[in-house]
């Protein structure tokens, strides 16, 4: 088992890598971030964050100031002094829907090379995969590490153990990732060797035992389950978890459509079924569907794995089909009350795929904005952190940083992302700024329908009769 204070290298200073490393520093370890992007490394050294995540910038600054967190482009040096190396690089979706492992492969090969020559080591190294990868990738990473070592001169056969591979999937929610890292529902570690599991158990000991100091009382967790399994099962857990969450959202959205047809209220239905312990209340918010960097990519990758094994994915296919229809429903609701969209002004309230992040990957706002623009509408978008990036991605989209500026002169507004600034809008002020019919399409069911109508808005939600 590693000592209480471990030397950790995190390869990939992106969203997952930054949160992982900063959280490990928070519980007492020393972390070196490794990234091949020199500009990113220089920016991080100067305190510039490449991603927006509440609490992350402060956590990184705290670790850097304490001398426990550093940044480098030198993989060899970082591997040479590490007890554990995390692979936390992007695995983008390929044209066939499968995860592209080229970044993971490049890092694994580099680790293998670093295990030879000047980086020869007396203690074994754990290589833990944080990247979301297909089932079987743990064995693949091990093979590529050995190939890299052989290319650089080979591993010394006289040494009993040089490295071991673990799968340690992340379950971070954008917008609350720091919290999720320190107070997780569970920690999953897949490995084929007992010593690898014990190294990871020691690394996460302060989180498992909740023994690190915190400012809150009481703690959100007493202890954290440490789930030990084989490599393949750990890799499948990640995909299965996200696919299930996507399916749950698509299910309630299907029910919301039926609620509109029958006069039922999907909020009441969600409350009624969510109190069943077998179902639970989370991910039962009807609206314009799921997006982001994880659910779409992971559902697609799981379908690709099934296709590779000649297995049908009828449920996942339906999950995706239901979600794909949601954006079109927004446009349909606008057309129903505005008639032609040509010459109409529409305000999009929120552009990121969810609150408290600047992530626009698979964000519903982008497709909605593009379709409205193609139909001749003028579209202005508001988002407190993602506006500038959205404007670069959607030609013709005008962005502002004040929701009331977005609403000024708008015939309709669409709640796309339920930021606190959007949920807490002064609805009477909003109505006073808009043009008739003062339509509010609530894509997140975030507003009180009675309050909206009382303020003079024409309210349209999802599944609310």
Model-predicted regions and their roles:
Residues 1-465:
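Structural/interface elements that position substrates and couple domains in central-metabolism enzymes
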């Amino acid at each position: 088992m590693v000592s209480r204070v471990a030397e950790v290298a995190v390869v990939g200073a992106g969203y997952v890598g930054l949160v992982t490393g900063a959280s490990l520093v928070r519980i007492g370890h020393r972390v070196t971030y490794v990234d091949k992007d020199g500009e990113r490394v220089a920016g991080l050294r100067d305190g510039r964050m490449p991603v927006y995540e509440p609490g992350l910038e402060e956590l990184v600054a705290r670790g850097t100031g304490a001398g426990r967190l550093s940044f480098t482009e030198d993989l060899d040096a970082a591997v040479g002094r590490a007890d554990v190396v995390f692979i936390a690089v992007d695995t983008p979706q390929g044209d066939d829907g499968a995860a592209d492992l080229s970044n993971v492969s490049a890092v694994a090969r580099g680790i293998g090379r670093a295990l030879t020559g000047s980086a020869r080591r007396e203690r074994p190294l754990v290589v833990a995969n944080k990247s979301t990868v297909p089932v079987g990738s743990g064995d693949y990473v091990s093979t590529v590490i050995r190939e890299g070592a052989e290319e650089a001169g080979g591993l010394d056969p006289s040494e009993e153990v040089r490295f071991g591979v673990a799968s340690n999937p992340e379950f971070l929610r954008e917008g609350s990732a720091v919290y999720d890292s320190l107070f997780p529902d569970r920690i999953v570690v897949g490995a084929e060797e007992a010593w690898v599991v014990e190294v990871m158990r020691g690394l996460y000991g302060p989180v498992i035992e909740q023994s690190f100091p915190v400012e809150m009382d009481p703690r959100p967790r007493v202890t954290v389950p440490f789930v030990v399994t084989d490599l393949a099962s750990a890799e499948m857990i990640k995909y299965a978890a996200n696919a299930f969450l996507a399916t749950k959202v698509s299910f309630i959205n299907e029910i919301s459509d039926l609620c509109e047809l029958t006069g039922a209220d999907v909020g009441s239905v969600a409350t009624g079924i969510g109190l069943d312990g077998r179902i639970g209340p989370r991910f039962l918010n009807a609206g314009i569907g799921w997006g982001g960097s994880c659910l779409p990519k992971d559902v697609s990758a799981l379908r690709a794995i099934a296709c590779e094994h000649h297995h049908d994915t009828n449920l996942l296919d339906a999950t995706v089909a239901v979600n794909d229809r949601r954006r079109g429903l927004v446009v349909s609701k606008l057309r129903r009350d505005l008639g032609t969209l040509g010459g109409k002004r529409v305000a999009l309230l929120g552009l990121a795929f969810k609150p408290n992040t600047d992530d626009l990957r698979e964000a519903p706002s982008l497709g909605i904005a593009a379709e409205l623009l193609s139909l001749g509408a003028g579209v202005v978008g508001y988002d407190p952190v993602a506006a500038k990036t959205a404007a670069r991605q959607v030609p013709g989209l005008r962005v502002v940083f004040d929701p009331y500026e977005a609403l000024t002169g708008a015939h309709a507004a669409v709640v796309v992302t339920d930021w606190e600034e959007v949920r807490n809008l002064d609805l009477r002020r909003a109505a006073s700024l808009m043009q008739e019919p003062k339509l509010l399409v609530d894509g997140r069911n975030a507003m009180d329908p009675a309050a909206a109508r009382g303020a003079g808005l024409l309210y349209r939600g999802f599944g609310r009769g």
